[in-house]
Regions:
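Extracytoplasmic beta-strand/coil segments of soluble accessory domains associated
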Residues: 55-97, 122
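C-terminal beta-signal and adjacent terminal beta-strands/loops
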Residues: 460-461, 523, 528-530, 625-631, ...
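Gram-negative outer-membrane beta-barrel transporters
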Residues: 373-380, 388-389, 512, 518-522, ...
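N-terminal periplasmic accessory domains that precede
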Residues: 52-57, 74-77, 89, 105-110, ...
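Periplasmic-side early beta-strands and strand-to-turn transitions of outer-membrane beta-barrels
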Residues: 139, 144-147, 153-154, 171-254, ...
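Face-selective signature of the C-terminal outer-membrane beta-barrel domain
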Residues: 221-234, 253-422, 427-428, 435-447, ...
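Outer membrane beta-barrel strand-and-loop segments of large Gram-negative receptors
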Residues: 215, 306-318, 359, 363-367, ...
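Short acidic/polar hinge/loop motifs at secondary-structure boundaries
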Residues: 94-124
Length: 709
């Protein structure tokens, strides 16, 4: 019922807003903008990209990085925050994946071969960008084609072929469009696959993957009106996630989105509707070595498979009103999700554990935002947002004694599980949060090309469905990958962050410098703390004795935390053809309630690159250096990592009109290192000790052939 009400409200508001958008605004002649570089965009046409996972492109952005759990399972990190704290949109659509461990993180729905650009808001994100932006906002834009310039239809497109040596990966895709002045019909098809990854001392097993994608869309444009509709099928097959307790058997997703835009003289009205249905199978036996019993033969009692689903439905309704000294932005938005997951044993039919049952998380939001110019040198952006978050979940259960044994560990575990399930089912599981956000950013143009900047914000985030409704000790944690089991807490408070950011933009004819410093204090930060339930601790210990999971589970709880640091982006043109680029990142994440650091925070790192550009070719030498990370979470039993540096070499040549060949070598010297954000090995592997740090990849020679027609 809330979803139907929201959609009715969307249609009603659009009806009243259309006349407003058509009002005469002849008084508006020009909008002057005073501001700073508040976003960073990586366009795939301008960037040499080797990986299949779009999230890996975040490493080239100031303040950003990724938590890597597999080759297709990168989770965005920004200034120390990651996962659900980062709002990620794919073509304006929010996607909550089916996997309770984020095997299908949002950026996995925008494959590199389909990607046009990836944009991150530097620092404080305006409240108009998305609903919950406590940790930042990222926008992935896929290829959609362009309208033609005449009435006759034209056939255009883009083909993309690639291969790489580190895992024998191959990718082939094609984007095709029929277009004229008013109509755009488009389609996309992609297939990619790879074997296990290599590192200097061996092979990472399992890390293979296979994925295919199909898209079909139509756009119409006439006068001030534009309409678009797109549907897509995103299928992932076998894909290893060695940092997690299971691997991907399949992820089958159906996605749709529609958009209407009216661009008038008074303002711009945008209405979007989007949704997806996602089904996900994962196992602990089909890609990695199955669990072993004491005789080192397959322990059939410990085979596990999980079937998980998610449903997404959402809308955005925004009106941008032009006024004499700036812009007003008004908006309503909604995102409604439903999650289910059940764990079974393919060898024993009666065995099951309901991981999540009809877990709902519905967010309705409204915002008002103002951008204005004060005088000729000062710009101000400010806004407020209200989000109402409604959550609930169904009853759960389990059968951990499928053989009906009269005594023994299965009986005890089943009884303990029943105690947890009964306590959970008898509790009031419905929760409502009323969250308020605000932000303000001031820019002041100074002398010598310098623009000064200061910003402040209050941002909130309600708990995820895992944090509230994980009733039994398990690793369904949204991709934490710390090897710990967790239980949720229904009555968690929303996180509240207060942040301040300062910096400046300084640019001239041959240089640019964009530094930012930030401090963020988070009240009720959701963090795992030692579980106090004797029942949960006992069942976790028994599972650990069976070789499944770890003892001493954590419980999602409200704590106090802070993040601070700086990041800087710079470039300097040594000549008309030679350019030096640099990005540096420093971030600290600390608990304030106890003396401990936060888990999985990116080490300090620096990227230095030297580019030489000719008229039809480009070559780039890049050095990537990471400092040692010994500021580690004792609560999460995090392991320290050492410093390392790698060299990358890449080049591009346009050998024919619209045809480009891109070649590169990553880790040119085949250095051995450990990626702090890649977590730990959870699968049997003769080359990597179980629960030890995942190694960095070895030398990777790659090529991409792109043809635009």
């Amino acid at each position: 019922m809330p979803k139907l009400t929201c959609l009715f409200s969307l249609a009603t508001l659009a009806t009243f807003a259309l006349p407003l958008a058509a009002q005469d605004a002849s008084r508006i002649n020009e909008i002057i903008v005073v501001g700073v570089q508040d976003s960073h965009t990586v366009a795939t046409d301008d960037t040499l990209v080797a990986p299949a996972d779009t999230a890996q492109m975040l490493r080239k952005m100031p303040g950003a990085n990724l938590n890597k759990n597999g080759e297709l399972t990168g989770i965005a990190q920004y200034r120390g925050m990651f996962g659900d704290r980062i709002s990620v949109a794919v073509d304006g659509a929010q996607i909550s994946g089916a996997g309770p461990n984020s095997m299908d993180a949002p950026l996995s729905y925008a494959p590199v071969a389909l990607l046009e650009s990836l944009t991150i808001n530097r620092g404080i994100a305006p409240v108009s960008t998305a609903q919950e932006t406590i940790g930042g906002y990222i926008q992935a834009k896929t290829y959609s084609g362009e309208f033609g310039g005449r009435e006759a239809f034209e056939f255009t497109g883009r083909t993309y072929f690639g291969t790489q040596t580190v895992n024998e990966g191959v990718v082939a895709s094609g984007f095709f469009a029929m277009t004229n002045r008013h109509h755009l019909i488009r389609g996309f098809v992609m297939n990619e696959s790879a074997s296990d990854l290599e590192f200097p001392d061996g092979v990472i097993t399992p890390s293979e993957y296979e994925r295919e994608r199909f898209d079909l869309g139509y756009s119409f444009r006439r006068g001030e009106h534009t309409f678009a509709v797109d549907i897509a099928r995103n299928n992932t097959g076998d894909a290893g996630t060695p940092a997690l307790p299971m691997d991907i058997l399949s992820i089958d997703s159906d996605l749709f989105r529609t958009r209407y835009r009216h661009t008038g003289t008074a303002g711009t009205l945008t209405a979007e509707l989007f949704g997806s249905n996602n089904e996900h199978w994962m196992t602990n036996f089909h890609l990695r070595r199955p669990p072993q019993d004491n005789m080192m033969s397959p322990g059939r009692m410990r085979f596990r498979q999980t079937f998980a689903t998610s449903e997404n439905l959402g809308f955005n309704l925004k009106y941008e009103q032009y006024v004499n000294n700036g812009v007003w932005n008004y908006g309503l938005d909604g995102h409604f999700t439903n999650h289910d997951a059940v764990v079974t044993n393919p060898n024993i039919g009666p065995f099951f554990l309901t991981n999540f049952s009809d877990s709902q998380r519905d967010v309705l939001g409204a915002f008002v935002e103002r951008s204005l110019v004060v005088g000729e040198t000062m710009g101000l952006d400010a806004g407020i947002r209200y989000n109402r978050v409604t959550m609930n979940t169904g009853e759960v259960g389990s059968n951990l004694n499928p053989m009906n044994m009269p005594a023994g560990m299965p009986v005890t575990m089943n009884n303990l599980s029943s105690l947890l399930a009964n306590g959970f089912n008898n509790a009031d599981r419905s929760q409502v949060d009323n969250n308020f956000d605000w932000f303000a950013r001031l820019s002041l143009e100074g002398s010598k090309g310098i623009t000064w900047y200061v910003g402040a914000a209050r941002k909130t985030r309600s708990p995820s469905y895992q944090e509230r409704y994980l009733w039994s000790p398990m690793e369904s944690t949204g991709g934490m990958a710390d090897g710990k089991t967790y239980v949720g807490r229904v009555d968690l408070n929303p996180e509240v962050a207060h942040e301040i950011e300062v910096g400046f933009d300084w640019s001239g004819a041959n240089f640019a410098l964009y530094p930012r410093a930030f401090y963020k204090n988070v009240i009720d930060f959701i963090q795992g703390t030692p579980a106090t339930s004797a029942v949960a601790n006992n069942i976790a210990m028994m599972m650990s004795n069976m070789g499944m999971g770890a003892p001493d589970p954590l419980q999602f709880s409200n704590a106090e935390a802070r993040f601070y640091g700086f990041d800087v982006e710079a470039r300097y043109s040594l000549s008309d053809r030679l350019t030096l680029r640099a990005i540096a990142n420093v971030v600290r994440g600390e608990r304030k309630d106890i003396n401990d650091y936060l888990y999985r925070v990116s080490p300090d790192n620096v990227i230095l690159a030297l580019d030489y550009a000719s008229e039809d070719w480009l070559v780039s030498l890049e050095s990537i250096s990471y400092a040692a990370q010994d500021r580690i979470s004792l609560t999460n039993l995090e392991q320290a990592t050492e410093a390392y540096s790698v060299l990358n070499l890449s080049g591009l040549i346009e050998f024919a009109a619209g045809a480009e060949l891109r070649l590169g070598v990553e880790n040119l010297l085949n250095e051995a290192y450990f990626d702090h954000l890649a977590a730990y090995n959870r699968a049997y592997n003769p080359d990597i000790q179980t629960r030890s740090r995942m190694p960095g990849l070895g030398r990777n020679i790659y090529g991409r052939l792109v043809w635009y027609f």
